[in-house]
């Protein structure tokens, strides 16, 4: 990347720096050509831990953080169903959905009518199809969002936060949100990490205009996801059941 591009991208600071996204697109065309591109993924701890694991921009090592503060530029459902109980490996789910409406794979079809998407189809009263939510979070001073795969145990708190913002006329991509973790316990007595959401501030008019372009770009990116996008080369523990699962990118 040329010095000129670096200088142009750095003209504005914070979220307003995104006003230089035309320069960023040019830089990406140069630096990412021929590469398989995906956004960095935040990892949730097992056993009720309260620190996120975030990929470092400076090295291959991850950084531990007590909170993530940024703009949720886009979010969508991320459903994953495995016919056989996942025990490890680099295999995608048998069926996945990124809109919560239509499943891709086997059995596929209408998610609302799918028997695997009903409470009680899994262990206890859980669903065989894991219902998650993918959040794309843009932190201040950065040009790419990071992704957080929100597990079922955190969906209620996220839903309540969304409702609280909408009731005040605020869209998620117009506010700065702070996300932390607290230890919770499910009905089976298994501890897991539950996300907590808090409003920090409204974006300025300049920031909102800049972030809107990122939201559209991320939305287009998400529209091209397939069940194979659920593959990851590392396994995690399901924070609700303690099972080894395939995490979402």
Predicted feature residues:
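OB-fold ssDNA-binding interfaces and closely related basic DNA-contact patches used
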Residues: 1-141, 248-249
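Extended serine/threonine-enriched, polar tracts that run as long, contiguous segments within proteins
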Residues: 127-202
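Short glycine-rich, low-complexity/disordered patches
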Residues: 40-42, 87-96, 129-130, 173-179, ...
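Long, highly charged low-complexity segments enriched in Glu/Asp and Lys/Arg with interspersed Ser/Thr
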Residues: 83, 91, 187-249
């Amino acid at each position: 990347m040329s010095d000129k591009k670096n200088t142009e991208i750095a003209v504005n600071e914070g979220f307003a720096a995104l006003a230089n996204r035309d320069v960023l697109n040019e830089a990406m065309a140069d630096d990412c050509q021929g590469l398989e591109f995906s956004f960095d993924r935040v990892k949730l701890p097992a056993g009720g831990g309260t620190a996120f694991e975030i990929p470092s921009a400076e090295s291959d090592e991850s950084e531990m953080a007590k909170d993530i503060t940024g703009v949720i530029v886009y979010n969508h459902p991320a459903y994953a169903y495995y016919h056989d109980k996942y025990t490890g490996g680099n295999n995608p789910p048998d069926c996945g959905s990124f809109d919560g409406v239509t499943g891709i794979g086997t059995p596929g079809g209408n998610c609302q009518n799918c028997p695997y998407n009903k409470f009680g189809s899994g262990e206890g009263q859980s669903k065989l199809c894991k219902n998650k939510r993918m959040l794309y979070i843009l932190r201040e001073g950065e040009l790419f969002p990071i992704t957080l795969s929100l597990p079922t145990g955190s969906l209620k708190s996220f839903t309540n936060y969304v409702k609280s913002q909408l009731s005040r006329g605020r869209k998620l991509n117009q506010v700065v949100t702070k996300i932390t973790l607290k230890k919770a316990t499910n009905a089976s007595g298994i501890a897991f990490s539950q996300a907590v959401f808090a409003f920090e501030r409204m974006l300025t008019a300049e920031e909102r205009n800049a972030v809107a372009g990122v939201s559209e770009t991320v939305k287009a990116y998400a529209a091209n996801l397939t069940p194979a996008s659920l593959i990851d080369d590392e396994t995690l523990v399901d924070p609700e059941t303690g099972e080894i699962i395939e995490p979402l990118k």
